[in-house]
Amino acid sequence: MPWIQLTLSCSEEHAPQVGDMLMANGAQAVTYRDGADTPIFEPRPGDVILWEHTLATGLFDADADIKAIIANLKQSNIFGSDLQYKVDALEDKDWEREWMDNFHPIQFGENLWICPSWREIPKPEAVNILLDPGMAFGTGTHPTTAMCLRWIDANPPTGKTVVDFGCGSGILGIAALLFKAEHVVGIDIDQQALIATKDNAERNKVGDKFSLYLPSQQPETQVDLVLANVLAGPLRELADTILGFVSPGGQLVLSGILERQIEGVIEAYQPHIKFDTPTIDGDWAMLSGTRVG
């Protein structure tokens, strides 16, 4: 069955609404891509982390009235007469090949890779996460996740207990376990994220060491390392909860923070955390530190 692919250019702020509009107009699937071709492996459930310039692509049946769909989109306050779009016709095999061709093994730090299952592993002796992102998972990795993965690579949590707070696809917890962490507790507000994490952990043969909870069920525990890749707002609002997981002398990694939000997030965790120098990647920042009180 042939398909029609409609790609729209929009801002990060409007991308989730654009995706909703594409689905409301009959799209069978929606993917997001950075306008500069920076891909993503891990979106946030209910709060998609995107980019300053985003391409949202809807996949429609071949008999969809694309002209009418475009006319509908032009009526929105988001686009109006400034709608920028591209229409492509794809055969089934073309869509599948195009989607798969967008995924390649990606290296983080010295010894950590993410590898789609259909690609040859470039470095078998390295730590390799096997991750087959579905269409909703985009086409690569966002800087917030990449910084965390590089931190894990540089600070292997061997023998440590870990909380992956806002686990999403489970990629950070899986990385910790593949670096020989003792156990990971994953927490997320989205049940579908927990299902995805469970599947990904089992694919990487660490499912027996990855316990998963909704916030209402999360255990009262303290661990050696807490990884929280969410957004600055929740990091501030949930500071007491997140701090409660960090054992004395334990480590804390916070990501999903814009550079201009660093000071506000640090204030929420002082005086309990002694932070290292922030890690910066583009407009994004990651904070790491040690619990001192």
UniProtKB/Swiss-Prot annotation:
EC numbers for this chain: 2.1.1.-
GO biological process, one term: methylation
Protein localization: Cytoplasm
SUPFAM superfamilies according to UniProt: S-adenosyl-L-methionine-dependent methyltransferases
Annotated catalysed reactions: L-lysyl-[protein] + 3 S-adenosyl-L-methionine = N(6),N(6),N(6)-trimethyl-L-lysyl-[protein] + 3 S-adenosyl-L-homocysteine + 3 H(+)
Disulphide-bridged cysteine pairs: none
InterPro entries (UniProt xref): Ribosomal_L11_MeTrfase_PrmA, Ribosomal_PrmA_MeTrfase, SAM-dependent_MTases_sf
Binding site for S-adenosyl-L-methionine: 145, 166, 188, 229
Gene Ontology molecular function: any one: protein-lysine N-methyltransferase activity
Alphabetical keyword list: Cytoplasm, Methyltransferase, S-adenosyl-L-methionine, Transferase
An annotated GO cellular component: cytosol
Main location: cytoplasm
NCBIfam families reported for this sequence: prmA
Function: Methylates ribosomal protein L11.
UniProt cross-references to HAMAP family, sorted A to Z: Methyltr_PrmA (MF_00735)
Family according to the record: Belongs to the methyltransferase superfamily. PrmA family.
Name of the protein in question: Ribosomal protein L11 methyltransferase
UniProt source species: Idiomarina loihiensis (strain ATCC BAA-735 / DSM 15497 / L2-TR)
Gene: prmA
